[in-house]
Amino acid sequence: MFFNKKYFWAIIFLGIIFSACGYRFSGEGNIPSNVKSIFIKIFENRTGETGVESLFTNDLIYEFTRDRKVVLRSSDKADAILTGVIKNMRIRTVSRENSQTPLERRVQFAVDLKLTDPNGSVIWSVNGVSANEEYNVAPDNNKHVTEQNRRVATAALSKRLAEKVYNDLTADF
């Protein structure tokens, strides 16, 4: 024989285990079957960062359109409405050259989300979903370069958080 019986049974056993335990890749779930279309309302921004609500909302819309599991519609035609609040944005120093000279900082967002039906009944909600991204502080205290690094980190963070929210939303159903 070309294969060993031990390997054959091991493969069969693993196949049964993975198919039986609901194993799936992140984001491969579905929102409820009665939700065929969704409206994503621009998120409320409770941070001091201007424009972060548009950035995050657009990144979240991209995640839904990329996957094509549901159609995006206007609020009056959608089966569900996704709303949310960007609660906070924190920036903390994570490494230093000395007590006065930061080398790297971390930006963090936290969001609350709610998916409701057109009547306002909550289908899904979660609070405090967060992610973070590090960025370099420019040498010689060059504020322009540091600010640019922070903006790039904020954009990367927004994309990653939108992906995380999408995966969390679809994994629950």
Residue ranges and their predicted role:
Residues 1-9:
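Bacterial N-terminal signal peptides that target proteins for export
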Residues 2-3, 18-62, 67-77, 121, ...:
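A structural "domain/chain start" motif
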Residues 9-20:
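Bacterial N-terminal signal peptides
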Residues 10, 29, 73, 100-102:
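Residues embedded in well-ordered secondary-structure elements
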Residues 67-68, 81-128, 132-149, 163:
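Surface-exposed short loop/turn segments
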Residues 146-158:
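Individual transmembrane alpha-helices with interfacial aromatic-anchor signatures
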